[in-house]
Amino acid sequence: MNVSDNYRFDGNLEPGNRLLIYAYGHWVTLDNLLSFDFIEITVRGSRLSIPDLYSFIRHWRAGGSPRLKFLRLEFDHQLDFEHFEDELEVVERDIAGEYRSRDDHFQNWRFDHGYCIQRNDGVKTVIDFGGGHFVMMNWSEIQLK
């Protein structure tokens, strides 16, 4: 199924365990991401920007998306993450490990240079990013190397 470049989703999705958008994820906006209520989210073909990611992190830090344990965005373009960590208020860096989904085949993500950030209520997440991806994983759900 091909989704038009002009497509916009302004509805609400019911809360769920997993949201998979394997292709044509360009329609997912920051507002959509802020309203999703899922434990694990994967979006491929994302067109979100660095400022969008900062906004999502601020939302998460303030207690938003409380059920989210795993977020994976794969971009349809390269993002410049050169100074990205400068805005993160990093608690710990160069974390290596693996996230394993409770459904063994849903999402596994290995990382070697993760950044740990902390929410206002003390919950921690590890962020891994590069030109083509951005991943957030709940600290309690990862296995450290």
What are these model-predicted stretches?
Residues 1-145:
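Non-core capping and flanking segments associated with repeat-based/extracellular domains
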